[in-house]
Every structure is written in structure tokens, then in C-alpha cells.
A protein has these predicted regions:
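Conserved "HGTGT" condensation-loop signature of ketosynthase/thiolase-family condensing enzymes
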Residues: 1-113
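Short strand-loop junctions, especially beta-strand C-caps/beta-turns
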Residues: 10, 119-121
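Acyl-thioester C-C bond-transforming condensing/cleaving domain
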Residues: 2, 32, 87, 97-112, ...
Length: 207
């Protein structure tokens, strides 16, 4: 049994659409009727230190307009249900994850990857993003695969723990751990200050 496991490489990817200021304006507009909460919102955002966040979904031209996104899926007064959001996840998440994997494995012998672990709590579809990554990224069809879902940020820690157990039990194993989240997919209309602040903390990305 191998005594140690190591993180050999790390790669990341973010979508093309920078949306932080747009979402700040959208969130602030939800507090127009609550000036005290809006002032508190602005102070807390300034203290956050966040400058940029990215989304797989292009924002609309006007953050105060009827449509929040360019496609018109998020319309004020009629935000989409879970079904549309999961279809959007299925459309966008594999491509974003594939970008990170391609950066990680550039110039590497991909046949050496024996296991893939994917974590995500912002979307799900079947048969799964793990299969999409295997096909898109040219991984072995015999690779062993696992999805850790709906555990929040802690899922990444569990993925590392599982990878460690795998490598310690088989010294020939090489585990690819992929953490992908589309947090901006779950924006909602609300006047709740805490929820609006949470929308302004998280973005889309993969590591």
C-alpha cells in the first residue's frame, strides 16, 4: 500500500461573461423599497473585496430591465423553475469543466488517468457530467467514475479524501478530481438581504 498521495497539478476555468457589477445592480434594485437594507447591502458589498465574478450566462444589456439575462430566461416576475435551470446546467457545465480538464492534461498521457471524481451542488442530469467529460476529453472508456453531489463546498474536501483512499489502495492509480459549479444559475427575485448578498458572493467556475 502506498503511504502518501499527492496533488500533482491544478487547473481552473471560468466562463467568458464577467457579471459582478451587473448582479450588484440587479440585487440593489430588489431593495428599492427598502432604503435602510439597500444602504446596508452597499456597505457589505464594498467590504467584501470582490472585484470580478463570472457566469456562463450573458447578462442582459440593462440590469434594471425586464430581462436579467440575454436569452430572456430570467424575466422579472417570472423567473424559471428547476427544470429549465437544470437544462441550462446540462448545456453549460460540461463545456466549462472540459476547459479546466484540457488545461490540466495538456501534453499529458490521458490513458494514465484511472479514476474521475466530479463534485457539484448546483446542477444534475443523467447519465451525467462525468460521462460527458470522459467522451469530450478523450479519457479511457474504462475509467472508474464517481459523482459527489449536493454537499456544497465540502464536496471538494470529500473528493480529495476519496482520491487519497484510492491512491493509497493502488499505487498505480491516478485520480482526476473535477469541481464545477454554476452558482449564478440559481439567482432569484427576493427582498431578503441575506439571500441577495449570497447571490453576490458566488460565481461560476471549475477547478
Amino acid at each position: 500500500m502506498a503511504s502518501n498521495a499527492y496533488v500533482n497539478k491544478i487547473a481552473t476555468a471560468v466562463p467568458e461573461h464577467e457579471v459582478h457589477q451587473f448582479y450588484l445592480q440587479f440585487a440593489a434594485s430588489m431593495l428599492d423599497a427598502h432604503p435602510h437594507r439597500r444602504a446596508l447591502f452597499n456597505r457589505m458589498i464594498q467590504a467584501s473585496g470582490i472585484e470580478r465574478r463570472y457566469s456562463c450566462f450573458a447578462p442582459a444589456g440593462d440590469p434594471d430591465g425586464v430581462a436579467v439575462d440575454e436569452r430572456g430566461n430570467f424575466i422579472r416576475g417570472s423567473f424559471p423553475g428547476t427544470g429549465l435551470r437544470m437544462r441550462a446546467y446540462e448545456e453549460a457545465a460540461p463545456g466549462l469543466a472540459c476547459q479546466a480538464v484540457e488545461r490540466l492534461l495538456a501534453g499529458e498521457d490521458r490513458s494514465r488517468i484511472t479514476h474521475i471524481i466530479v463534485t457539484s451542488c448546483t446542477g444534475f442530469y443523467a447519465p451525467g457530467i462525468d460521462l460527458d467529460l470522459i467522451e469530450r476529453c478523450g479519457l479511457s472508456p474504462g475509467i472508474e467514475r464517481t459523482i459527489i453531489g449536493f454537499m456544497g463546498c465540502y464536496a471538494a474536501i470529500n473528493a480529495l479524501k476519496l482520491a487519497r483512499h484510492i491512491v493509497r489502495s493502488d499505487s498505480r492509480a491516478r485520480v482526476l478530481a473535477v469541481n464545477v459549479e454554476l452558482c449564478t444559475l440559481h439567482i432569484n427575485e427576493t427582498h431578503d438581504l441575506e439571500k441577495l448578498l449570497s447571490f453576490c458572493l458566488w460565481g461560476d467556475g471549475c477547478a
